[in-house]
Amino acid sequence: MSEALQVLASHITENSGGLALSSTVAFGELTVTTTVENIYALVTFLRDDARCGFINIIDICGVDYPERVERFEVVYHFLAPKQNQRIRVKLSTSEDKPVPSICPLFPGADWFEREAWDLYGVMFTGHPDLRRLLTDYGFEGHPLRKDFPLTGFVEVRYDDTVKRVVYEPVELKQEFRSFDFLSPWEGTDYVLPGDEKAAK
């Protein structure tokens, strides 16, 4: 299988007109890297080229690397049913650099792009309806970013007295704790019942 993927990777690199920056085959999966400027043209090539035939979109997701200048990776997964092959396409972007929407090519990308925007804040230009999908309408921030607080900003609950959902500041029942991983629970010296069997 990896030999067929190597052949496909060479075909994409040689025939896409420089749209693919690099390609790797690892663990039986082909990954192609591109740029924000080339994503639309590369996806069009992958769909329309007879050798590729990636006509099904499986997923679009985001990854946050806060230490990078372009902190977000947008990862696309496609399927070519005739060839029974999958491909992963990656690109890097920043908070203020939008990615062209591929909804005109794959209408099924609509909700995937909305999810990536909702959870990571990756903007998609040309998207028909870029609004929140999983979080509430008034939600502030993007919860899968590494710098988003674990507790969030507000607590949402249903109040039975007013018969509606209410938003309140987060109230923790106990303080955050700094855990000492060199605690006395690690590496105990006392003997437990049954330990004498292991010593023999």
Swiss-Prot record:
<keyword id="KW-1278">Translocase</keyword>
<comment type="similarity">
    <text>Belongs to the complex I 30 kDa subunit family.</text>
</comment>
<keyword id="KW-0830">Ubiquinone</keyword>
<protein>
    <recommendedName>
        <fullName>NADH-quinone oxidoreductase subunit C</fullName>
        <ecNumber>7.1.1.-</ecNumber>
    </recommendedName>
</protein>
<dbReference type="Pfam" id="PF00329">
    <property type="entry name" value="Complex1_30kDa"/>
</dbReference>
<dbReference type="GO" id="GO:0050136">
    <property type="term" value="F:NADH:ubiquinone reductase (non-electrogenic) activity"/>
</dbReference>
<keyword id="KW-1003">Cell membrane</keyword>
<dbReference type="GO" id="GO:0048038">
    <property type="term" value="F:quinone binding"/>
</dbReference>
<comment type="function">
    <text>NDH-1 shuttles electrons from NADH, via FMN and iron-sulfur (Fe-S) centers, to quinones in the respiratory chain. The immediate electron acceptor for the enzyme in this species is believed to be ubiquinone. Couples the redox reaction to proton translocation (for every two electrons transferred, four hydrogen ions are translocated across the cytoplasmic membrane), and thus conserves the redox energy in a proton gradient.</text>
</comment>
<comment type="subunit">
    <text>NDH-1 is composed of 14 different subunits. Subunits NuoB, C, D, E, F, and G constitute the peripheral sector of the complex.</text>
</comment>
<keyword id="KW-0997">Cell inner membrane</keyword>
<keyword id="KW-0520">NAD</keyword>
<dbReference type="InterPro" id="IPR010218">
    <property type="entry name" value="NADH_DH_suC"/>
</dbReference>
<dbReference type="InterPro" id="IPR020396">
    <property type="entry name" value="NADH_UbQ_OxRdtase_CS"/>
</dbReference>
<dbReference type="GO" id="GO:0005886">
    <property type="term" value="C:plasma membrane"/>
</dbReference>
<keyword id="KW-0813">Transport</keyword>
<dbReference type="InterPro" id="IPR001268">
    <property type="entry name" value="NADH_UbQ_OxRdtase_30kDa_su"/>
</dbReference>
<keyword id="KW-0472">Membrane</keyword>
<dbReference type="GO" id="GO:0008137">
    <property type="term" value="F:NADH dehydrogenase (ubiquinone) activity"/>
</dbReference>
<keyword id="KW-0874">Quinone</keyword>
<dbReference type="InterPro" id="IPR037232">
    <property type="entry name" value="NADH_quin_OxRdtase_su_C/D-like"/>
</dbReference>
